[in-house]
């Protein structure tokens, strides 16, 4: 019974943290080289059409409900340099998976 209840309460989608990287031209040991991407908007698309968006909140955290399947991931507005990684994700039915995204700032 408990297993059935747990399965019924499972939310299909993703959650995690979005960071910007690098935040400075030279990364040094002991000095953070990334930062939470508060306010970043992730766009999850299927078959070339935007399915849903998620905005990173405090600490770069995001949560998004998605149907099971494969999605392309991009930023809104589109990144002129770098982009977001990973660019493709798979959502499994009945699973609320943890997936962190990194936005490449293009700083070198």
Region locations from a protein language model:
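Surface-exposed loops/turns
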Residues: 58, 67-68, 93
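Structured interaction patches on ligand/partner-binding surfaces of diverse proteins
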Residues: 78-106
């Amino acid at each position: 019974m408990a297993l059935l209840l747990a399965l019924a309460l499972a939310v299909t989608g993703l959650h995690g943290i979005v960071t910007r990287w690098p935040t400075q031209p030279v990364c040094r040991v002991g000095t953070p080289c990334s930062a939470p991407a508060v306010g970043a908007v992730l766009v999850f698309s299927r078959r070339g059409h935007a399915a849903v968006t998620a905005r990173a909140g405090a600490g770069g955290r995001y949560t998004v409900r998605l149907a099971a399947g494969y999605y392309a991931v991009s930023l809104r507005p589109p990144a002129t340099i770098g982009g977001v990684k990973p660019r493709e994700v798979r959502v499994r039915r009945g699973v609320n998976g943890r997936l962190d995204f990194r936005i490449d700032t293009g700083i070198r």
